[in-house]
Amino acid sequence: MIIDTTTTKVQAINSFSRLEFLKEVYETIWMLFPILILVLGITIGVLVIVWLEREISASIQQRIGPEYAGPLGILQALADGTKLLFKENLLPSRGDTYLFSIGPSIAVISILLGYLIIPFGSRLVLADLSIGVFLWIAVSSIAPIGLLMSGYGSNNKYSFLGGLRAAAQSISYEIPLTLCVLSISLLSNSSSTVDIVEAQSKYGFWGWNLWRQPIGFIVFIISSLAECERLPFDLPEAEEELVAGYQTEYSGIKFGLFYVASYLNLLISSLFVTVLYLGGWNLSIPYIFISEFFEINKIDGVFGTTIGIFITLAKTFLFLFIPITTRWTLPRLRMDQLLNLGWKFLLPISLGNLLLTTSSQLFSL
C-alpha cells in the first residue's frame, strides 16, 4: 500500500513537471511569435520597396523595368538576394577581419531595433515605451559606427573616406531630426509612439501633426533622407568619387547586408513619418460622417487590427514615392554643401521650430 501511494505521488510530480515544461515552451513560442511575424513583415516590406523603386525608376527614365523574375518582375529582388547569398565572401588581405565582418551586422541590427516601437494599432506594438521615439533615435545613431568600422577595417582609402563621410553626415542631421521629434513630443505630451498617434486622432484629418508642424515635417523629411543616405545625400558611397565608399571591399552576403540596411532604414523612416505626422493607423477621413457611417475608427477585434495595419502601410508606401522620385530628380550635393545645409540651415530652423512649439504649449496652459 505504501509503495502504491509513493508511485502515485511520483507520477503526479512527473505529470506536473511535464505540464510546467509545456507551459514554458508555450510561453516561449507565444513570446517569439510576434517577433517572427514582424521579421516576416519587414522582409516582405523591403522586397516591395525594392520592386517599387525599380518600377518607378524605370517609368521616370522611360524604360522597361524588371519583367522576367516573376509576374511584373516582383521576384527580382529575391533573385538578386539569392545570387548574393551564393557569392564568395572575400576578405581584404591587410584589413582588420574582425571589424570588417562585424560592421554590416551592427548596421542592420541597430536599424532593426527601431521596429520594436512602431505601432500598427493601439495594442499592436511590440514595445510601447514611454521613451519610444527617443529610443529609435538612440539605436539608429549606432548604425554609422558600424559603417565607420567597415571603412576602417577594409584598409582601403576609399572605404575609410566613405566611413568618415557617413559618420559626419549622421552627426550633422541627427540633431535637427531629434529637435523635430522633440517638438512632436511636446505637442503630444508624450514620447510614446502610441500616445502620439492617439493625440492626432482627436480631430481626424485636421489633427495630423503635418498641419501643426509643417516646418518640422519638411526638416524631418530632409534629415531622414540624409540619415538613409539617399540621393542627393549619398556622399558616403558616391560612385564617381569613392567607387562604392565603405562597401568597396565587400562581396557576397556582407554586401547584401548593407543593401538590406539601406532599405530597412528607408522603410522605418517612412513608418515614423506616418506615425509622427500622418496620423498612424487612424483612417482620418476629412468628412466625419463617413467614418461615423462605417464606424471604421470604432471597430475592435481582428478586422479593426487589419484595417489599422492596412492604413499604416498605405500611408507609408504612398510617402515612399517622395524619396524614390527624389533619387532621379536632384543632383548629388558636395560635402561642404551637405554640412552647411545641416548645420547652418536645418539646425537653426529646427531649433526655432522647437522654441515656437514650446512657447505655444506654455501659452495654451
Curated annotation (Swiss-Prot):
Where in or outside the cell it occurs: the entry states: Plastid, Chloroplast thylakoid membrane
Q: Does the keyword Thylakoid apply?
A: yes
Q: Which GO terms describe its molecular function?
A: NADH dehydrogenase activity; oxidoreductase activity, acting on NAD(P)H, quinone or similar compound as acceptor; quinone binding
Write out the GO biological process terms: aerobic respiration; photosynthesis, light reaction
Q: Give the catalysed reaction(s), semicolon-separated.
A: a plastoquinone + NADH + (n+1) H(+)(in) = a plastoquinol + NAD(+) + n H(+)(out); a plastoquinone + NADPH + (n+1) H(+)(in) = a plastoquinol + NADP(+) + n H(+)(out)
Question: Record's PROSITE patterns?
Answer: COMPLEX1_ND1_1, COMPLEX1_ND1_2
Top-level lineage group: Eukaryota
Q: How does it sit in the membrane?
A: Multi-pass membrane protein
Q: Which InterPro entries match?
A: NADH_UbQ_OxRdtase_su1/FPO (IPR001694), NADH_UbQ_OxRdtase_su1_CS (IPR018086)
Chief location bin:
plastid
E.C. number(s) listed in UniProt? 7.1.1.-
Q: Which cellular component terms (GO) are annotated to the entry? A: chloroplast thylakoid membrane
Family assignment from sequence similarity: Belongs to the complex I subunit 1 family.
- What function is annotated for this protein? NDH shuttles electrons from NAD(P)H:plastoquinone, via FMN and iron-sulfur (Fe-S) centers, to quinones in the photosynthetic chain and possibly in a chloroplast respiratory chain. The immediate electron acceptor for the enzyme in this species is believed to be plastoquinone. Couples the redox reaction to proton translocation, and thus conserves the redox energy in a proton gradient.
Supply the HAMAP family for this chain. Answer: NDH1_NuoH
Complex and partners? NDH is composed of at least 16 different subunits, 5 of which are encoded in the nucleus.
The protein here is known as NAD(P)H-quinone oxidoreductase subunit 1, chloroplastic
**Source organism (scientific name):** Spinacia oleracea (Spinach)
